[in-house]
From Swiss-Prot:
InterPro entries given in the database record: GPCR_Rhodpsn, GPCR_Rhodpsn_7TM, Olfact_rcpt
Membrane spanning residue stretches: 46-66, 78-100, 117-137, 151-171, 223-243, 261-281, 288-308
Matching Pfam families: 7tm_4
Biological process, per Gene Ontology: G protein-coupled receptor signaling pathway; sensory perception of smell
Originating species: Homo sapiens
Protein's recorded name: Olfactory receptor 8A1
Membrane association type: Multi-pass membrane protein
Cysteine disulfide links: C114-C195
Cytoplasmic face residues: 67-77, 138-150, 244-260, 309-326
UniProt GO cellular component terms: plasma membrane
GO molecular function: G protein-coupled receptor activity; odorant binding; olfactory receptor activity
Signal peptide limits: none
Length: 326
């Protein structure tokens, strides 16, 4: 996602310039993967294959369910269907290649393939960051301004918000991937299981300071804008919920937001651990665990989180199943 700390260690510029003068063009990279232990390759393959299958079924199921049931044709579920699409897409950018690597002797990825993986991963992760923010704003309008909800969150507004979210993802990814394309690489072993910015930057044989600072401020803008919007939205939401006189009303209002809060907490928590810290604080194993969590586990969990406590989704599932069975 590009939340890169400027404290990230790199080789001195003099050493990098010396290397840059002698390096040959890298045409492919080798992904180190999650582990070198041969006895763990098959169990990990089966584990992540299961996670990926659940991710596909869950997110495609959520999108299909929302499309087939007219009672779910509301702004909240329109945004949720796009969130499911993003989860499905960025998981599909990472997981299939990771599964192949578990059963391959050499985890090779071409230069073009690596940069393409980075580009599309960033598109959907940055877009998801802003989509969660849009969903927080939607809940704010629904709870704090219920009488104006249909006017504020009109069909045109929803389409515009989603278009802006994808545009931000495309622009952010283009900038960050473009910076990575300009770097010369003289090493080919990526200490990670996919092509991410931090591991790739370590392979450059020129100074990465300008790239680091550009990516850091770009990512800083993204995370500050989105996190502040979510924080402000839920501050007003909590204030409105506490002002509801009936216990039933408070419970219903809070239940509509609890799922989103859980998704926001998991996503921002894991990405912040990965990118908003000096790399010396955590080990490679800890970074891999955090990275696996937000690239593979969160896309699997989001459909479950939004459906388990949602009466409308449960009712839509029952209606769809009855329609198929009878």
């Amino acid at each position: 996602m590009g939340f890169l700390s400027p404290m990230h260690p790199c080789r001195p510029p003099t050493q990098r310039r010396m290397a840059a003068g002698n390096h040959s063009t890298v045409t492919e990279f080798i992904l180190k993967g999650l582990t070198k232990r041969a006895d763990l390759q098959l169990p990990l393959f089966l584990l992540f294959l299961g996670i990926y299958l659940v991710t596909i079924v869950g997110n495609l199921g959520m999108i299909t369910l929302i499309c087939l049931n007219s009672q779910l044709h509301t702004p909240m579920y329109y945004f949720l269907s796009n969130l499911s699409l993003m989860d499905l897409c960025y998981s599909s950018v990472i997981t299939p290649k990771m599964l192949v690597n578990f059963v391959s002797e050499k985890n090779i990825i071409s230069y073009a393939g690596c940069m393409s993986q980075l580009y599309f991963f960033l598109v959907f992760v940055i877009a998801e960051c802003y989509m969660l923010t849009v969903m927080a704003y939607d809940r704010y309008v629904a709870i704090c301004h219920p009488l104006l909800y249909n006017i504020i969150m009109s069909h045109h507004t929803c389409l515009l918000l989603v278009a802006v979210v994808y545009a931000i993802g495309l622009i952010g990814s283009t900038i960050e991937t473009g910076l990575m394309l300009k770097l010369p690489y003289c090493e080919h072993l990526i200490s990670h299981y996919f092509c991410d910015i931090l591991p790739l930057m370590k392979l450059s044989c020129s100074s990465t300071y300008d790239v680091e600072m550009t990516v850091f401020f770009s990512a800083g803008f993204n995370i500050i804008v989105t996190s502040l919007t979510v924080l402000v939205s839920y501050t007003f939401i909590l204030s409105s919920i506490l002002g509801i006189s009936t216990t039933e009303g408070r419970s219903k209002a809070f239940s509509t937001c609890s799922s989103h809060l859980a998704a926001v907490g998991m996503f921002y928590g894991s990405t912040a651990f990965m990118y908003l810290k000096p790399s010396t604080i955590s080990s490679l194993t800890q970074e891999n665990v955090a990275s696996v969590f937000y690239t593979t586990v969160i896309p699997m969990l989001n459909p479950l989180i939004y459906s388990l406590r949602n009466k409308e989704v449960k009712a839509a599932v029952q209606k769809t199943l009855r329609g198929k069975l009878f």
